[in-house]
């Protein structure tokens, strides 16, 4: 640990390398934890590459898995994954701020300029304030999401398992990770007719997708006219792609009997809305993706690419 500490805080090691090394270390430790027999329900050793892929996906909130998380991993293993999702969801700059706050180190000019440009602040005081706001907002929104989801999960799974499901999926949605522990390998397909679950997850995904800088701007300005250009562009783009995406999916899948063709109009709109919100980044599914039309798959690619350019 002393060697790691010296490496992380060596004066010649720049901040980007420190954070990169920190994330790599977290991913590796997470993989080793998932390999332990206690992490699997069958109490078997998970192959290293499978564990490493899962922890990398969780930390980078991509949502890709080689293993059915809900069916394979135990409560301990799921908790490790959830911790990594939360850590990854906080983001690069937030972790950077926390590192400086905890270590009580002064930020150099180069790092100060990097943080100022990214966060829109020029002082360490502003950075500390933003980091605290990020932690508070994240905790509050994820808690509210878990409470709403518990309305469905607790009656179905019992109090403790239901609350765990609620917390896990709330955090996963808010961090745009897309991990689920339903256990049937079909993501949210079993809740495709449940507006409470789908809308709650979609709202969490949308709010989380705005980013911390936009939240801080909204909290500080409290008025649309006073928001900076960056915040307005992100908010309007989010609304645009959700609305247009919903409409496009609704049209393209309207007559597809393998997806929403046999559903009522209301259920078609709900499924199209959820697909539009989650396709861009979150990865939750309420439809079987292989059954989508080719045009819908192409549109999904457009939505995912749009995230890169915003």
Show where each model-derived region lies:
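Membrane-proximal intracellular helices of multi-pass ion channels
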Residues: 1-308
């Amino acid at each position: 640990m002393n060697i790691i500490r010296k490496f992380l805080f060596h004066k010649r090691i720049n901040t980007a390398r420190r954070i990169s090394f920190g994330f790599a270390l977290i991913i590796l430790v997470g993989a080793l934890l998932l390999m332990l027999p206690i992490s699997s329900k069958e109490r078997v050793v998970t192959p290293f590459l499978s564990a490493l892929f899962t922890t990398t996906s969780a930390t980078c909130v991509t949502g890709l898995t080689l293993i059915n998380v809900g069916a394979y991993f135990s409560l301990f293993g799921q908790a490790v994954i959830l911790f990594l999702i939360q850590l990854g969801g906080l983001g690069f700059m937030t972790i950077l701020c926390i590192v400086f706050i905890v270590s009580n180190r002064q930020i150099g000019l180069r790092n100060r300029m990097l943080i100022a440009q990214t966060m829109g602040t020029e002082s360490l005081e502003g950075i500390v304030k933003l980091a605290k706001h990020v932690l508070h907002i994240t905790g509050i929104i994820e808690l509210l999401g878990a409470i709403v989801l518990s309305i469905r999960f607790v009656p179905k799974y019992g109090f403790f398992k239901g609350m765990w499901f609620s917390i896990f999926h709330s955090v996963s949605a808010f961090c745009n990770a897309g991990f689920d522990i339903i256990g049937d390998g079909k993501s949210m397909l079993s809740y495709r007719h449940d507006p409470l679950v789908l809308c709650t997850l979609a709202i969490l995904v949308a709010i989380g997708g705005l980013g911390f800088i936009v939240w801080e701007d909204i909290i500080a300005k409290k008025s649309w006219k006073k928001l900076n250009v960056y915040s307005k562009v992100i908010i309007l783009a989010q609304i645009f792609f959700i609305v247009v995406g919903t409409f496009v999916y609704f049209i393209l899948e309207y007559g597809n009997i393998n997806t929403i063709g046999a559903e009522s109009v209301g259920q078609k709109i709900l499924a199209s809305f959820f697909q539009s919100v989650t396709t861009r980044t979150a990865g939750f599914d309420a439809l079987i993706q292989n059954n989508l039309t080719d045009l819908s798959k192409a549109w999904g690619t457009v939505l995912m690419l749009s995230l890169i350019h915003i």
